[in-house]
Amino acid sequence: MSAPAGDPYETRLNIYYGPLEIIREKELADACTYKWYNQTLCRVNDSVVRMAVIEGEYHWHQHTVEDEFFYVVEGRLFIDLEGRTVELAPREGFVVPHGTLHRTRATQRTVILMVENATIVPTGS
């Protein structure tokens, strides 16, 4: 699925890898030319693992029911929360609890993995 017309975010909800396949996140990230790209890599029970390549900022949003886990592969990720900002370096992760207003941003090209419930639509709400 592509982003709606005029939306700067390229979001693909199709599951790229099936069970028993080697997941090659680096190959996908290296081939990415988008400033903001989100690809669902695989499904694990009721959750999905998504890879994002980002540069710039996302809009403020929250998920009313589900938590989100962010893990930085390369670059630096900033997660703005009400009242504070969390900065993540490579090999660091952070959980945003459901109901928490937040936005993600990166001042340089950054690759992250997200683990979240499969019901989350990664465009935020």
Predicted regions and their residues:
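A cytosolic small-molecule/anion-sensing beta-strand core signal
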Residues: 45, 73-74, 89-90, 108, ...
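Short acidic-glycine-tyrosine-enriched beta hairpin
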Residues: 82-98
